Amino acid sequence: MVRGKTEMKRIENATSRQVTFSKRRNGLLKKAFELSVLCDAEVALVIFSPRSKLYEFSSSSIAATIERYQRRIKEIGNNHKRNDNSQQARDETSGLTKKIEQLEISKRKLLGEGIDACSIEELQQLENQLDRSLSRIRAKKYQLLREEIEKLKAEERNLVKENKDLKEKWLGMGTATIASSQSTLSSSEVNIDDNMEVETGLFIGPPETRQSKKFPPQN
């Protein structure tokens, strides 16, 4: 008798559902065992019944097989991540290469090279770009010139101030020297007047017989 094909949908009758579960569970466990023995495969099978009852089979250890599975999933994820990163790096490199090529073309055009195939609009754009570049260059040049002029003016002011300070210092030293010399000279004159003795003489009679009389100095 030919068995009819079972329709793949949930069995509504609870008793029939439990009977079908028991039959299929035993068949699945048997197939898992046969696969592990015949093919030397590491097999782990975990089944929860509709009533949450656990059934399991493992050719070695459920925990060891699950740990191996998790490691493998992690390795696959890392490989996918590396592949994604490699693809992203290749895309970025390709994009940068295209940008560099475009910049090289633009640079040659700005130098007047490779413009034979340019249209009037492209040439006008190049001219406008050069004008803007020249304006920025001139503005920067004038800014640097102004800064250099201000720097030189500041140095000049500092030199003038230093020269003035040195001149005032020199004049002050000269005045002090003259005053010191005058003070020393006056002191010497006073000492000379105090120590100097004057001799006076009175002569009576002929020159050959005259005698002198000395008078003591007056205080």
From Swiss-Prot:
Q: Where is each K-box domain found?
A: 86-176
Residue ranges the record marks as coiled coil: none
One Gene Ontology term of the molecular function aspect = RNA polymerase II transcription regulatory region sequence-specific DNA binding
What drives induction of this protein's expression?
Maintained at very low levels by the polycomb-group (PcG) proteins MSI1, CLF, and EMF2 via histone methylation (H3K27me3). Derepressed upon cold treatment (vernalization).
Name the PANTHER family for this protein.
SERUM RESPONSE FACTOR HOMOLOG (PTHR48019)
Q: List residues of the MADS-box domain.
A: 1-61
In which tissues does this protein get expressed? Mostly expressed in the outer layers of the root meristem (lateral root cap and epidermis) and in the central cylinder cells of mature roots. Also present in rosette leaves and seedlings and, to a lesser extent, in cauline leaves and flowers. Enriched in apices including the shoot apical meristem and developing leaf primordia.
Q: Which domain of life is it from?
A: Eukaryota
What Pfam families does this protein map onto? K-box (PF01486), SRF-TF (PF00319)
**Per UniProt, what is the name of the gene that codes for the protein in this document?**
AGL19
Native source species: Arabidopsis thaliana (Mouse-ear cress)
Q: Cite the InterPro entries for this sequence.
A: MADS-box/MEF2_TF, MEF2-like_N, TF_Kbox, TF_MADSbox, TF_MADSbox_sf
The function of this protein is: Probable transcription factor that promotes flowering, especially in response to vernalization by short periods of cold, in an FLC-inpedendent manner.
Assembly and partners are described as: Interacts with SOC1 and AGL21.
Consequence of gene disruption: Decreased response to vernalization, the promotion of flowering by prolonged cold.
In Swiss-Prot or TrEMBL terms, this protein is called Agamous-like MADS-box protein AGL19
Instruction: Provide GO CC annotations from the record.
Output: nucleus
Looking up Gene3D superfamilies in the UniProt record yields: Transcription factor, MADS-box (3.40.1810.10)
Keywords (A to Z) from UniProt: Developmental protein, DNA-binding, Flowering, Nucleus, Transcription, Transcription regulation
Q: Where is this region: Disordered?
A: 77-96
